[in-house]
Amino acid sequence: MQKLQISVYIYLFVLILAGPVDLNENSEQKENVEKEGLCNACTWRQNTKSSRIEAIKIQILSKLRLETAPNISKDAIRQLLPKAPPLRELIDQYDVQRDDSSDGSLEDDDYHATTETIITMPTESDLLMQVEGKPKCCFFKFSSKIQYNKVVKAQLWIYLRPVKTPTTVFVQILRLIKPMKDGTRYTGIRSLKLDMNPGAGIWQSIDVKTVLQNWLKQPESNLGIEIKALDENGHDLAVTFPRPGEDGLNPFLEVKVTDTPKRSRRDFGLDCDEHSTESRCCRYPLTVDFEAFGWDWIIAPKRYKANYCSGECEFVFLQKYPHTHLVHQANPRGSAGPCCTPTKMSPINMLYFNGKEQIIYGKIPAMVVDRCGCS
């Protein structure tokens, strides 16, 4: 009996000594597993972020119908960028992409960018026409996609050089036509009279919507325009061929077309930051910096919040297609698991140069991740 009691005491003593050691080992193992899990999650998110940035670059070029990024230097941009009110307003009042809950979903969005405003600079005409012994002022080419949208506004902007004394300026916009029997080579579009005072030069806009619509209907009639702005002494104040120091003062067209809004349903998802320990499918912040790419051809925005999705998708988290959960329960081996993916996206507005050195202000759909979910 005494031997049995001694054996029991020894056994209990061993358990007491061994117990804490096992608990500590289990705790350390659990902590190591958690750390390893967090490390793997960080690596996965970093890879997802890098892939998202590369995908964004490809999407932008594709949606703008560009095979490669336009090769426009900063010096060329300074010369081409008009120093004019409409462009300055677009840049100064630029609607930087906000993280809001505005409607717009991945399913309802068109793929290609919908143009809202196009700023077209003059180019050389294929037909080198002469007007009164001098080359014509301005010829504008229009992208074919404008023909499939309704033109709601078309303004010709011209810059008038400063004057030293108060004067009245007579502005004439003439449309070039094929030579007629009597020798006429142009017809009037608009005429206006304005008073100028000494000081800085001014920008003047002229409505040319009707002319533009006619050009779009009959492209062969687009031979260019002639601009005249004569003061009381007969001096032409219009900048048609910029002199040294007059970069950015070329005439240009500002064309606005309609953009059809779309309605969509609202989805909900988790929002996380980079330090989050959330393992489920979540939306994480990501800022895309175009200057870091060397994409100087994008005038604005220079950067925007794109966001990305990352995380696990267990079937209990499935949001978009609940019936998939039932299918998985019925046949777990034959069902592919859900993926963490954008369920709601919104567009960004962008001001950029295209391959023809035209300035475009357009909307690019599905560029910002608003919600993430499992599907």
From Swiss-Prot:
UniProt-annotated location(s): Secreted
Residues of the signal peptide: 1-18
Posttranslational modification: Synthesized as large precursor molecule that undergoes proteolytic cleavage to generate an N-terminal propeptide and a disulfide linked C-terminal dimer, which is the biologically active molecule. The circulating form consists of a latent complex of the C-terminal dimer and other proteins, including its propeptide, which maintain the C-terminal dimer in a latent, inactive state. Ligand activation requires additional cleavage of the prodomain by a tolloid-like metalloproteinase.
Keyword match Glycoprotein: yes
UniProt keywords, alphabetically: Cleavage on pair of basic residues, Cytokine, Disulfide bond, Glycoprotein, Growth factor, Heparin-binding, Secreted, Signal
Site (Cleavage): R98, D99
Sugar-modified residues: N71
Keyword Repressor: no
Domain of life: Eukaryota
SUPFAM superfamilies cross-referenced by the UniProt entry: Cystine-knot cytokines
Gene3D superfamilies noted in UniProt: 2.60.120.970, Cystine-knot cytokines (2.10.90.10)
Gene Ontology molecular function, alphabetical: cytokine activity; growth factor activity; heparin binding; identical protein binding
Prodomain residues: 19-266
First-listed, main subcellular location of the protein, grouped into a coarse class: secreted
An example Gene Ontology CC term for this record: extracellular space
Biological processes, Gene Ontology terms: myoblast migration involved in skeletal muscle regeneration; negative regulation of myoblast proliferation; negative regulation of satellite cell differentiation; negative regulation of skeletal muscle satellite cell proliferation; positive regulation of lamellipodium assembly; positive regulation of macrophage chemotaxis; skeletal muscle fiber development
Cited Pfam families: TGF_beta (PF00019), TGFb_propeptide (PF00688)
Disulphide bridges: C272-C282, C281-C340, C309-C372, C313-C374
Assembly information from the UniProt record: Homodimer; disulfide-linked. Interacts with WFIKKN2, leading to inhibit its activity. Interacts with FSTL3.
Reported function: Acts specifically as a negative regulator of skeletal muscle growth.
Similarity field: Belongs to the TGF-beta family.
Designated name of the protein: Growth/differentiation factor 8
Biological source species: Equus caballus (Horse)
